[in-house]
Amino acid sequence: MSLSRTTQLPFAKRQFFQVLARNYSNTQDADLVVIGGGPGGYVAAIKAAQLGMKTVCVEKNATLGGTCLNVGCIPSKALLNNSHYLHMAQHDFAARGIDCTASLNLPKMMEAKSNSVKQLTGGIKQLFKANKVGHVEGFATIVGPNTVQAKKNDGSVETINARNILIASGSEVTPFPGITIDEKQIVSSTGALSLGQVPKKMVVIGAGVIGLELGSVWQRLGAEVTAVEFLGHVGGMGIDGEVSKNFQRSLTKQGFKFLLNTKVMGASQNGSTITVEVEGAKDGKKQTLECDTLLVSVGRRPYTEGLGLSNVQIDLDNRGRVPVNERFQTKVPSIFAIGDVIEGPMLAHKAEDEGILCVEGIAGGPVHIDYNCVPSVVYTHPEVAWVGKAEEQLKQEGVAYKIGKFPFVANSRAKTNNDQEGFVKVLADKQTDRMLGVHIIGPNAGEMIAEATLAMEYGASAEDVARVCHPHPTLSEAFREANLAAYCGKAINNV
């Protein structure tokens, strides 16, 4: 019997402690110490405790949840959701027969965001308590293969001896050379989530996921937003080219401005005015942009500073990541790493999966993850989501594929919701019909992509999904119709 997600805990505990008795002494203070209380770390800590390990989580910040819950996924979604409601009230309600006057109360919107964050971070604390996970607030440094020291705010140091150490320290904002972030006028994603007033003009460096989401928030609230992107498309790496073009067109209609194939040369500040110097990446054409808020969103980098990796001779790769094997194990057998500090997309759900799998592996179970089945979502309006390969990747790999598409304008639920922009696109192997990638732009794309992810995880064909009964009327029918088009060349409800 192997340890899996369906294994009963008594067996898991029994097998785990048999492994410990064979390989370790019993003098340590913990079975596992987790460095970092973000999505990967806190989930791993809880899972480890559920498997019977005495677990301690060390987090440097006062609240648990990491970047995602405190200054990332959660607060940004709160602002995206509420700014969308305001935009609908001002620009969409009248067409629905709703007459009203809506205005922005920014302090109240920020308070609602903060309340969401507070409830969720507090919830993790309760989960730790319920699962008997130890929590130490302090900065963790690895001083040996089985020892972590946590320096607390009062200057005291707590030493934790552990059979295993799991690094889940996350990532930090990548700085832009020559531009100093003050989180007031020149801001990172952190500052952009807490601006005290709506900018008149905002320039966003980077038209990836973070830049587009936060730019959308402030554009809806009244700012004139221009995104400067070095690449020739919006949406970052991995997005399907056709989807990206439609995405840019949609955001442009909303008032978003874009300068693509353009690099930022520098920025200077004079009082409340920021001057941004840009240059065409292809033609070398120079121009200047003026704004009162500059958002730097050029990505994130692994956070490993001060972890003490050199104390255990762990070297980083050329991108600052911790090298691990297929069991998330470093070159030191007792030290593991997951999430943003290792290779792969910097996504909270990817870190969560790795955390669960890693501790199951420590307990003697199997470890497997298919990174081709890790979905990505951009929570703008319309939403954009994808999983698997894009057309460009399949062409580059020389894979013969077929396409099935279905527009939301032909979907009954999208019609009744008066939210019918976008489409579902399915890429399937031309010979076997196996789904290779799914790309959605449109309403609730982030929710719909879960079905596609499940189908791909189980190796489904387009025909498999096309033959599954979907409830009517729902947006999910568009996914079925796209698979029908991929499988037999034609959807039912589209000419």
Swiss-Prot record:
Q: What is its main location?
A: mitochondrion
**Originating gene:** dld-1
The entry assigns this protein to a family as follows:
Belongs to the class-I pyridine nucleotide-disulfide oxidoreductase family.
Name of protein: Dihydrolipoyl dehydrogenase, mitochondrial
What is this enzyme's class at the first EC digit? Answer: oxidoreductase
What does the record say about how the cofactor binds? Binds 1 FAD per subunit.
Which subcellular locations apply to this protein? Mitochondrion matrix
Record-annotated residues binding FAD? 59-68, 77, 169-171, 340, 346-349
